[in-house]
Amino acid sequence: MRNEEAEKLFWIFNNKVRPINYSEIVENTTPRKSSINREKIESENNGQVYNELFFFKLLLNEDLSKFLISLINTNLRHEREKKLDKGKDISRLNDLTDITFWKFITDYLKNIYSNKNNDKIPPELINLKMMDHNRYSAVHNVLDMKSHRFEEYCEIFMNSALKYINIGNVLNCDETIYAYYGKDAIKDHILINNDSKPHSVGIEAYSLTTKLNISNCPYVISYGPRTPENCQSPFNSLKTLLDNLHSKYNWEDPRNNLIVCCDSAFALVNNKECLDELKCRILSSTRKSGVTVPQEIKIFVKPLLTIHKTFLFYDESTGLLYEYTKNTAGHINCIATNLYSRYSNPYVEINNNLNIEQFATIGNLFRFSKKELELIFVGETLHGTTLEILNGKYKTNFVKPPCGPFWNEQMLKKLSAEHIAQIYNDKYKKENNNLNKNDKIKKILEPLDSTQDGGIYDKNKNYSKKELQDLKIKVIGTHQNRSQMIHDQYIFWYNLVDITDKRYYATIRGSSSHSYTKLFILGGLFDLILNSYSLHREYHEMELECKNPENQPPEIIQTINKFVESLIFQFHELKELQ
């Protein structure tokens, strides 16, 4: 530690301010700043290539490539038979070979990227003539791998990978939207619209994700599509994800070691029994506006901050957490946040009549001592997922409530008519000058249609039990008959969540996913590429971290080849059982 930092920390202790030891709640890791958007991979044999395609080829050995090609060729054969019966040309529906398969994959990657100015085709494909438009379209249209074998392979991929990586104990729960514009989903009111997502219109899903400890790449642990409910869907979806997680990993006492960071919508349940069922601790947050920033702390932290560090100051008297960050221009920004944690602890008494923010402060989670001031100095020891929640998430938005996800009548009546009009127009996506201020307030307080509200309400439209069951079957399918189900296009591991889509998925054109078939292409091929990239990046970073081979822990000496070999072995076992 530099002398300047030591002197500052000495000042902290002398002034009764205590740094918080994060090892009490999270693993002590050293996340690195890494970008998975457009980074190039240097290799003697590959030069500069699409890094995703390079890792995808590492994952797909000859057997797996043949398997994927066979699925495509089966669909091409069915299409040829249809065309032959009608006497039409079938030349563009000929079977794919290994070379033409990689031609198609390369063309596909080129077409879905929104910015490809700096990309180069892999050397082994440079001299190959790419597919003509008709041939490419024909393959693109039949690439519908709704095979149970393919879905089971995806499950093997996830389970095998988790044997070699440490997922940590801090997870992030968030929603994402999978682009889809089908009329069937519109008719059933399953589609939602959220302009903040890379693809604003589509079907919503919830996921639990973490970051790989060394490479800092995102990796999704559990996934579930959103289903219509007569209650708040985010909380129920979170409970389902956690139940699946506990059954898979069988933690002895998960309440002591599992922390889930999420938006406030996932924690707004005034019911002690519901919280007990979660079997974890929930760290959630709401933005607090209109507060005075402690200028003396701002001056104090300025020499301590670097661009990639965050300084958190908790004032117990106000219950606010002040987050100081330094931007690239060197200016110090501060955001005041009301943080609270939710325990699934039977010994914690919860009064259902209290406001949500009065249940438990962040002090319960971080075990603050009873002092006037408390300080959290966040360097590089905080888990990356927690940083994702605490750093840069709370942006000023005048159409959103200053605290919590819901407006109430008392808040709205204090606002001007122009401000009310902005909130009304944002909610209903249209202007209505015929309504006065009070009428607009009433409309703002009304919940939207239960399945088109962006995930906040799911209790306005009172579905019968049969209607709910029919809609759930349409979304997640059944084991007996899944050929017509949306779940065929949303296998569980299609898992790009908010932590990922802002960094990676935004580079993909939304027009590449305008049907179930093309949506499944993104879910199948592109996520295989993303997951294999994250895992291989993790292994590469592991090798750099472990300079002394004698001190390498068992999970680190597992090489990429061993991982792929185990994956292939299990896949062959699965095929033999069918």
Curated annotation (Swiss-Prot):
Function: Involved in regulation of group size of aggregation streams.
Protein name stated in the entry: Suppressor of smlA
Gene Ontology process terms (BP): positive regulation of aggregate size involved in sorocarp development; signal transduction
Gene Ontology cellular component annotations, sorted alphabetically: vesicle
Species name: Dictyostelium discoideum
